[in-house]
């Protein structure tokens, strides 16, 4: 019997169907961004079920089966170098929650492997935990595997635990033997050239206490995992996971862009292609699941993966941007099982292009400096890059330590990581010492043992309240006199504490001859701390005061907060349904809304969004506010802030048919109370994050007053009526544009004149004319015009021109088709030459442009170009 050759999609489908037919509920893959706060990413198929295994959540079904997307980066350096290491992989799994156990799990796994996937039994070897006699007996007596093909393994290999204490149990693994001809005399499962582990069965049957004692669990569970990529390698009979149909099409796209043949490539090139194939799957799925590149957490993992893709692309000769092209292949391969890939295609490609463009600039600077560091005599002597140099690359140029280590390793060098860490700590200390910090919390040197504050502000603007604590200068106080600043805790309060982007209420505390102005309110552990100044009288611990918020400020904040909700709803409706909030500020005079979006909004889109918000305001939608379980709120479609952790019971602010969000802020009862809404600006603030600033309600009048003053000043300056200003500015812009065109035309004519003088410098090489020359002070566009003209005049020829101006280098190559026929492509040729000047570029086979950052290297670059042309055209 021989194994059936199946596609990756067929393997996944057969696995899930097999278990579905055996009463398992098929569940969709969970997001790569887990709900478990202890891990950054979903690293295993069982992670979504961890709360059930740990007894923290009740089971909803006795059996389940999934194809779970996972990411692990702990051994990223092995990706592409071994046959089966990956960052992104799919784990096929079947799970039992207190239902079937060891005998059934083993029998099902064997039936699936030998009947459905038709793996020859004589090619399978299994492992068990050394003390698991029960599993050994099941494999031998019930399944019929010879005892010598059942390997007993140590705890490190075949015993699973969720931590030092808690549920745990032995494992059993199934291995495929690629070389049965070697016989069974010496079976070494660590020989990964012969054996591949493709199915792991975890039998959770014990609870481990703090003393290490094991006691049987009342409800025993099964957790299994089959690597989809590994099973594909086995069934498709390819030498490694990368050459399966799950990954190889991505590799093929990358190799086509690089114009190389994977099959004929050397090992180093194949490693780079495999890294690209693996990492592109990872980054596409991460972005699809809402991760954006950053310098912290999972955002840093994404950024690191993208940068590795870019760098390995350069290693195989790709000089321009390419990541979005290979991502398209990754999306096409997996969109049927993970539809959010196609839904978020625009976001994925935009994020890749943005990160790639930025990193290419970083690479150009960093690689040049790193090359200089590696060329230093002391580096060559010690075969070691100092921590100081590595940190300078990181701190000054944004060059990642991991990348420095990779390049160093490729050149036979090491990096002093411990010294790098010391430099990092020193930098942090320097940064901290450059700032003074003031702790404004009531717990500054004071431990307050009091009950949480009762918040009344959703319904009441004033309320009597008892003073529970007074804090000043780091001490608890009993009495505070007029003129003093103090932090006050009340038993209940109508004051909204700053949270969720909304600033705190302002107002007063009052009593007999007492007035306390409240300037801020902060909240810690549900204790509201009022920051106030005693304007008159004396405030005492335990006294009763009247807490009164400023109604005008509250109404302004409410209008701006509700307008923020309407703004998000309009953006999701009119621009992109995947838009999510990245931050906000709701104050009395304005609002600011930050949101994840891969592109800037068009002017007409801004107008449409503003019009939609004003339309909803005019329609007078009433608010419905309710508390409900989080899952119920999500099921109703309530919008939550991505990455935010919510309590089991949440507050939902709903303007039916318009906006429904999880929110603890204060809002208008009816949208008509807002009055009017005006967008002031829309701009990018960081990679993939946009910001809209706007005003609502009475704040719009303040904004219009300022704008009218500006218009009046411009009218006076241009001596024009306000309605004539646009035409007057347009005329000035057109005059400037015409002048610039005339200047460019003159530059072009000058370049042509100069180029005609160079014709006599052309040299004959075989049947071709070659001309390599510098044209000082000529810009890139004029240089291109000159190169094309010279190539046409010289006919069968190769022309390379260079120019240095304003600290930059411009290079152009123009080749005739006959030169292309000799294997010389202008795009690749000029890209290689530009590297000498610390730059890069590319283009078509017959015409290409490049740039560089080091004018001092231009002469060397042109000399190299001439030598290469002579050698290539002989």
Curated annotation (Swiss-Prot):
Gene Ontology terms for molecular function: alanine-tRNA ligase activity; aminoacyl-tRNA deacylase activity; ATP binding; tRNA binding; zinc ion binding
Domain of life from the UniProt record: Bacteria
Cofactor(s) demanded: Zn(2+)
One CC-aspect GO term: cytosol
Keyword annotations from UniProtKB, A to Z: Aminoacyl-tRNA synthetase, ATP-binding, Cytoplasm, Ligase, Metal-binding, Nucleotide-binding, Protein biosynthesis, RNA-binding, tRNA-binding, Zinc
Gene3D superfamilies referenced in this protein's UniProt entry, alphabetically: 2.40.30.130, 3.10.310.40, 3.30.54.20, 6.10.250.550, Bira Bifunctional Protein, Domain 2 (3.30.930.10), Threonyl-trna Synthetase, Chain A, domain 2 (3.30.980.10)
Cofactor binding annotation: Binds 1 zinc ion per subunit.
Residue sites binding Zn(2+) per the record: 561, 565, 663, 667
InterPro entries: aa-tRNA-synth_II/BPL/LPL, Ala-tRNA-lgiase_IIc, Ala-tRNA-ligase_IIc_anticod-bd, Ala-tRNA-synth_IIc_core, Ala-tRNA-synth_IIc_N, Ala-tRNA_ligase, Ala_tRNA_ligase_euk/bac, DHHA1_dom
GO biological process terms held by the UniProt record: alanyl-tRNA aminoacylation
Principal location class: cytoplasm
Family designation: Belongs to the class-II aminoacyl-tRNA synthetase family.
Function, as annotated: Catalyzes the attachment of alanine to tRNA(Ala) in a two-step reaction: alanine is first activated by ATP to form Ala-AMP and then transferred to the acceptor end of tRNA(Ala). Also edits incorrectly charged Ser-tRNA(Ala) and Gly-tRNA(Ala) via its editing domain.
Name this protein carries in UniProt: Alanine--tRNA ligase
Organism: Trichodesmium erythraeum (strain IMS101)
The organism's taxonomic lineage, starting at the top: Bacteria, Bacillati, Cyanobacteriota, Cyanophyceae, Oscillatoriophycideae
